[in-house]
Structures are given as structure tokens and as C-alpha cells.
Amino acid sequence: RIENGHSSADFEVVMGQLPNAIIPFARIADINIFVRTDNIDDLDWSDLIQTALFDSGRSTLLVSSVVPASIAKRIVIAWNGSAEAARAVAMTMPLLQQAEAVFIITVDDEGDDHNPSKLAATLEMNGVTATPVSTNADQASVSSALIAKAVKVHADMIVIGAYSHNRLGEMIFGGVTRDLQSRSDIPILMVH
């Protein structure tokens, strides 16, 4: 919560069987924040994040254990034209409106349904100046290409519509969301 320029937060110690024990808390939070660490014993980290995303109806912010110098000043929107990506843009509009720079990144753009220029025009109507950027994955994964481009534009946050492919397919084959969770040092704001 932000009041008079000061922010506040509450922290809860959750008792019970993870990941389901977090659901009642996650549903009433403004945002769910997870700090990624390499030292998690006996807990499937991606299950915890998936539960927060699928079962809370709230945004989830994943940050690495390295504290960033800034956050939400230079935002990358990972745009694939999906309903989840559109929802992510809508839910983060206040952040986008206050950012110093916004970039819409598409990877291997193949169609008009996820044309970054059309999204930029829509954002402009909401007071957000966004720069469309296309890139190719080539031999790298989509998440690697996305991270590389985000680093190049000095992004301090990536906004993504999480799990835009079905949950089972993402669990079996991986996917951009899951790959970003494990590889990005840039904070990721995920919306499903």
C-alpha cells in the first residue's frame, strides 16, 4: 500500500502444505512477491509460483536475490498477442504510465494478431509511449532472446502474460514463463 508517498507491506508466515497453503493469502494480496533463491530445499519453486498465478487472480512478481538499482522505470512487455499478455498489459497500466521507458518486445513475430505497433498505438491512447522491438530467437530459446533484448534496452522489469499455452503443455515441455523464472535476473511481473 502507498500512502503519502510511503509504502507498506505485510509479511505472513504460512503454515500448512505448500503450495496450496498460500492460496487464501495470495487471493487477498495486492501483489504476490517471490524472491528466487538457489537454496530451496524440498520445495518445487515453480509449483509455488504456478499456484499463486493460477489460483489467486493476482499478479506475481518474481525477483532474484540481487537487489536491483531500480524497478519499473524501464519496462519490457513480452508481447505474443495472447489473452494473458493483454491481461498483463491491462493490469500493469498504472506502472506503465509511470515508467520512464516502455518497450514492447516480440520474438519471432509471425502474424498481425500480435503486432507490437498496434499495441503501442493503444498504449499511446492511455498515456504510455512505448517502443516496439522485434527480435528473433534463431538458435536460442525465446526466453533467451527476450532476456538478451531486455538487457540491451536496460530494462529493470519484464511484464509477461504467464502460461499462455495450456498448463499441462508448459509443465511437460517447459515454456517461456518457466524458463524466464529460472534464468532472468531482471524482475518479472507475471499475470495469468
Predicted regions and their residues:
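Alpha-helical scaffolding segments of alpha/beta enzyme cores, especially the outer helices
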Residues: 24, 51, 94, 118-121, ...
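Short, small-residue-enriched loops and turns at beta-alpha junctions
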Residues: 40-41, 109-113, 137-140, 166-167
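Charged helix-capping and loop-helix junction motifs
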Residues: 46-49, 117, 146-147, 172-177
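Redox- and metal-dependent alpha/beta enzyme cores, enriched for Fe-S-associated oxidoreductases
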Residues: 81-133, 137
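Intrinsically disordered or low-complexity boundary/linker segments at protein termini
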Residues: 20-106, 183-192
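A short, terminal or domain-edge coil/loop segment
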Residues: 9, 13-17, 57, 61-69, ...
